[in-house]
Amino acid sequence: MFKNMLMVFALGTLLAGCASHNTHSAAYDRATDARIRVYFGASTHFFFNTTCEPKKGVLGFGGGGMAVAKPRTLHLANTTIGMPVPEDAYRYYDEYVIKANEPLTISVEYGGDSLPDFNGFVFRSRFQHIARTFVPLAGKDYEAFASNSSNSLQLNVRRLSVVGEHVQTEPVGIKAAPKCQVVSPDPAG
């Protein structure tokens, strides 16, 4: 019995590791939009048309924005919209159409105590959080991914361009995004 359960688990794990590509047609206007690929691994949120990071609401939720990547172990299908893929691309990602020529703030969180995954394991590591901002240009393709260099969480943003049959990458300058200030109403009215 144990051997059969182990075989079923091994087969499920093997199949979960096979990323599929779900290609979606997204409304994309090169004159007003940009595209961005976000790699899985760290919890990642987009905040549109702001250079600061909105405050989270009750229990860590809210603050607007959009969750674009979360660590996951079961649903590993990529969502693609036709962006070029560089040779060094990670295996699992989602792609999005975003407004160009407006600031995009990206927050990334990694670590901390997490809930048990489907195997019953609990992963614990130091909680790290960063937020960065940049202005995507119209008609350009980007990718964003977290890295952990020197035990410090980093956000990397690269611009993609196709030259001949190759996809080239170029680092994009990003700035720290502070927490947004809560504006209190003026008591004088």
Language model regions located:
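Short loop/turn and low-complexity linker motifs enriched in small/turn-promoting residues
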Residues: C18-F127, A131-T133, D141-G189
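Sec-dependent bacterial lipoprotein signal peptides
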Residues: M1-H21
